[in-house]
A protein has these predicted regions:
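Short alpha-helical segments used as structural interaction elements across diverse proteins
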Residues: 37, 45, 111-112, 163-164, ...
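Short, charge-rich amphipathic segments
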Residues: 38-40, 78-89, 178, 212-221
């Protein structure tokens, strides 16, 4: 990703997120202090922030399931285009923690951010477009062509101007506290890791495996969809 930000390359970055199922990472290395956990999360966060900070535009192409860490990455891109039937959300808030990157507030506003994060429910791609979480949704068989068409249009513009116009919008987000909120998000995730439900989920994973533990966690929520 950093290499593709070279000023010598006239190319736009298309970041594809496609999950057949939710992917979860369980750290079973032993207990960490709150401070150690927060620092670990911030170190990982700095790598993801390259998407936000790099000069060239990055388009997120979302199909399938974009859940948990997938949303951390996709929402740092400059524009998000998804399939109508994609599913976007952070179901780990039901038992494990909080998003370690937080752009939800800026893209959805406070009420819908809370609606999704307080339940772990997901949005279909078409609904995500209606609410402004993504730029646009299209039928799945049109997704790649739609993203390529936008990338081709961006490629007609001088890279210095692309960088300038991306940067001023992102600086506006920074003036609204976006960079500070990311650090606070890492700390809130570390705080969430102290919840009794996280330890219970870890035990379920050790006993039943990740798939069954996830099904047990999600069973009370039905189809897990939030409908505008």
């Amino acid at each position: 990703m950093i290499h593709s930000d070279s000023p010598c390359l006239r190319i736009q970055n298309i970041f594809q997120r496609h999950y057949q199922r939710s992917t979860l990472f369980i750290d079973d290395s032993g207990a960490q202090s709150f401070d150690d956990d927060a620092w670990r999360l911030e170190r990982s966060q700095r790598n993801r922030m390259a998407l936000f900070d790099m000069h060239k535009p990055v388009i997120a192409q979302i199909h399938g399931r974009c859940l948990a860490g997938g949303t951390d990455l996709a929402m740092l891109c400059d524009m998000l285009i998804c399939a109508d039937d994609a599913r976007i959300g952070f179901p780990a808030t039901r038992g494990q923690g909080s998003p370690p990157n937080h752009m939800w507030l800026y893209m959805l506003g406070p009420q819908w951010s809370k609606r999704l994060l307080l339940t772990g429910d997901q949005l279909l791609g078409s609904d995500a477009a209606t609410l402004g979480l993504v730029l646009k949704s299209v039928p799945a068989d049109r997704l790649e062509a739609e993203v390529e068409e936008l990338a081709d249009r961006l490629a007609q513009v001088d890279t210095d101007l692309l960088a300038a116009n991306k940067r001023i919008v992102n600086l506006g987000l920074e003036l609204m506290g976006a960079k500070t909120l990311q650090r606070l998000a890492a700390e809130m995730d570390a705080r969430g890791h102290l919840a009794a439900s996280r330890e219970e989920f870890r035990k379920q994973v050790m006993e039943h495996g990740i798939r069954k533990a996830t099904r047990m966690r999600d069973a009370p929520f039905g189809d897990g969809l939030a409908r505008p």
